[in-house]
């Protein structure tokens, strides 16, 4: 497959993923509205009762009434251990057991967190892979071109351009007497191997 075709296929894949992500968002809009909205910003969690009760709204957390807060319940410095649980919004003066919807909230909050959807994560991963592959191809072609431009190295040409092989004018060098083989008739200390039997 040619490199131009690869880039076209990659662009088509990225485009189809983007369209797929937009289709998912449209489907989410067609779902009926839930009676609660949860907003998390930093360590603050805000629960909104969408029944439009205004100041007549009463909140209950795990069976205990919360202070008067209207249709919005602010939970600053949210603690996952202490403030997670069942929340219910109901009209003041009515029984919370009669409320049609309950909310189970378990959230993890932090100071500098960012919420990312699946499409953002998928886009980051795909772009990272594309950049990595692009750098790999760049280094590959750069090293291939550099290798082709380099001068070939011939062996033996370093000594003034002389050819290899034995020079007919000069005899072979005399062997070094320090490395002569041991003579068979010689009985020196180191003239033979130690043949001690155990």
UniProtKB/Swiss-Prot annotation:
It is found in: Cell membrane. Residues 166-183 are annotated as: NUMB-binding region. Residues 188-198 have a biased composition (Polar residues). The chain crosses the membrane at residues 118-138. SMART domains: IGc2, ITAM. The modification Phosphotyrosine is found at residues 179, 190. Disulfide bonds join 49-89. Residues 169-196 form the ITAM domain. InterPro entries: CD3_esu/gsu/dsu, Ig-like_dom_sf, Ig-like_fold, Ig_sub2, Phos_immunorcpt_sig_ITAM. Residues 22-117 are extracellular. Residues 1-21 form the signal peptide. Pfam families: Ig_5 (PF16681), ITAM (PF02189). Residues 139-198 are cytoplasmic. This is T-cell surface glycoprotein CD3 epsilon chain.
